[in-house]
Amino acid sequence: MVDMDGVLYRGEQALPGLRDFLLLAATHPFVLLTNNSTMTAGDGVAKLSRMGADVPVSSVLTVSDATARYLASALPASSRALVLGSAALRGAVAGAGMELVDAAADVVVIGLDTNFSYDSLTEAVRSVNSGARFVATSLDPVLLTEDGVVPGAGALVAAVRACVSTTPVCVGKPSAPMFEMAVQALGLAPTEILMVGDNLDSDIAGGAAVGATTALMLSGVRGHAGGHHRPDLVFAG
């Protein structure tokens, strides 16, 4: 299992050794993971292709696709979904059989939404307070881009959470759903899997929680270095 953001690239810039790293990874079963809810697996494949690296779509798991799979397993078909997120996330949720709505939802899904507004926040809060399930793609408060730090999906989740009594189910790293899907895709026991990432709080903590060996890439280390999430291996990147 390999994190994409900060390990393979940052924004639209490939990190040194990208193609060599993926050639090495391809000698074993692998899956690439990202908490970026603005991409589907197909988008991830296209992005890597632009950087000169070709991977099969079956080897990419984005949090948009993982969230759609989670909803399909947790809710009846045609459930009403209020999605605050990108076109990729909305398309994935609709593809999972959910009906996209703007209010009075059965489930509220929060991802990275650059069009987030007071009105959309209001409808999300009203739906959750009326009993809708509350699902977050991730709790990452910020994203690293070529231009610096920008608010992540977790910042928007926090805005809704501040107004409701319901704790959201988080699908993405470091939570269990996405890691369990990745382990299932690999068809291996967790103890046979190496999780490579640059984020102590999501990649390393989540990989360890599922039972994988963890490796920290120093290419873009994030997280609380003084915390309890210590990797088994460390690479300079």
Show which residues each predicted segment covers:
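Asp-based, Mg2+/Mn2+-dependent phosphohydrolase catalytic module
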Residues: 2-24, 37-61, 65-237
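Conserved phosphoryl-transfer catalytic core
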Residues: 28
